[in-house]
């Protein structure tokens, strides 16, 4: 009887190992998807950490997944399953994209998306006097009618190139924000020409700086300028 039970346990173990082996034989996620989120005004849309995303929904599945964009408006995911996906950019400071497209994602799949930003930051200049940084720029709106209210504008200052909302030094960034709370159509030309000042930068340090304009859409999203390097003399 003991021998019979022992043989039974051996057979059960073999069947279990065989079943596990079959499961492990399935291909892993080896497809990739990359591209650019392009501004209709030209160039890549400047984004920030955790803002703009590419939303993907695999055909036949109900739960979507997302690919976060990088600060320079590029995106990439190298661990996707080969399949057809419904794809749309979302979450950024641009007019909502309502039409999804279907992309057959395999190894090395590339696709770019063009969006219309809420606000375009133009003529962005920086000047440093001692430890005080002055930032000047103007704002325009490709589509003014129906634009979400402009809440505020502010500098973003950090010691790394990863600089933006959620990635900045508060004492140089948030405290120097300027409240606007106006519709773009109610702003004068003077309102649209903005000057920000960042005082008391640390001598001998290098900073990375950009500006942003925040709107009252459902994401509280911001449009950003490019990132510039500021070297403060000792």
Residue ranges of model-derived segments:
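Beta-strand-rich modules
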Residues: 189-191, 196-221
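Bacterial Sec-dependent N-terminal signal peptides
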Residues: 1-42, 233-234
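Glycine-centered loop-to-beta-strand initiation motif
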Residues: 35, 69-78, 113
């Amino acid at each position: 009887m003991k021998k019979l039970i022992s043989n039974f346990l051996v057979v059960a173990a073999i069947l279990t190992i065989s079943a596990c082996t079959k499961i492990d034989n399935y291909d892993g996620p080896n497809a990739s998807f990359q591209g650019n989120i392009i501004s209709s005004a030209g160039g890549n849309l400047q984004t920030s950490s955790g803002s703009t995303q590419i939303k993907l929904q695999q055909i036949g599945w109900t739960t979507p997944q997302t690919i976060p964009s990088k600060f320079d408006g590029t995106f990439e995911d190298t661990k996707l399953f080969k399949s057809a996906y419904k794809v749309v950019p979302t979450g950024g400071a641009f007019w909502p994209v309502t039409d999804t497209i279907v992309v057959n994602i395999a190894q090395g799949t590339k696709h770019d998306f063009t969006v219309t930003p809420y606000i375009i930051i133009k003529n962005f200049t920086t000047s440093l006097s001692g430890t005080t940084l002055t930032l000047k720029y103007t704002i325009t709106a490709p589509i003014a009618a129906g634009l979400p209210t402009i809440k505020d504008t502010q500098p973003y200052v950090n010691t790394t190139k990863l600089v933006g909302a959620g990635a900045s030094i508060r004492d140089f960034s948030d405290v120097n924000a300027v409240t606007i709370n106006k519709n773009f159509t109610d702003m004068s030309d003077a309102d649209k020409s903005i000057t920000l000042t960042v005082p008391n930068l640390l001598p001998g340090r290098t900073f990375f700086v950009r500006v942003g304009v925040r709107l009252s859409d459902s994401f509280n999203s911001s449009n950003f300028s490019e990132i510039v390097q500021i070297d403060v003399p000792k």
